[in-house]
């Protein structure tokens, strides 16, 4: 996969290097799958899914800047087909879809929310520790039978409330998702595989 990166005028480059293993795993699992990327940033996980043969991808982020960047990343890789970019508040979108009578279904979902957000574009303040249970429940409601949800956070003090999520199968895969060049910082992010 090829990605446009920025080394000039942003604090971020457009690519989270520590997420290489999860993106590669998504690519390897994506063949003929319907992929949903929430809080998608520049869409790199969606590009990996498309390169891996995903039947469709839906890339959702609140920022037009990042969605334009995601489109450039798709174009850079010559990706065509059923790959949609949607500007939306992911929390509101998820809540609406999870409560819908006819829910969309996805075989693979990547959920990598911010630790905290009080964006003017959002209806409410978001705190990953306080809000992760509802967020994961809503995302899991969109899983097709046999589907997998990958949830990641870089909040160093994060604690998964497995008691409140006991109706889901949750596996901590954090150790396997830390690339070798980040191994000295094992808390760079946490990652779980979740299914119903």
Residue spans for each PLM region:
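Helix-to-beta-strand junctions that scaffold the AdoMet/dcAdoMet cofactor pocket
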Residues: 79, 143-144
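S-adenosyl-L-methionine
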Residues: 63-108
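C-terminal catalytic and target-recognition region of SAM-dependent MTase-like enzymes
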Residues: 134, 148-196
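Non-catalytic substrate-recognition/targeting regions of SAM-dependent transferases
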Residues: 1-16, 24
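Mobile active-site "lid"/loop adjacent to the S-adenosyl-L-methionine
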Residues: 66, 87, 107-138
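Conserved SAM-binding motif I beta-strand of class I
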Residues: 56-61
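Conserved SAM-binding loop of SAM-dependent methyltransferases across substrates and taxa
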Residues: 42-55
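Conserved class I S-adenosyl-L-methionine
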Residues: 32-41
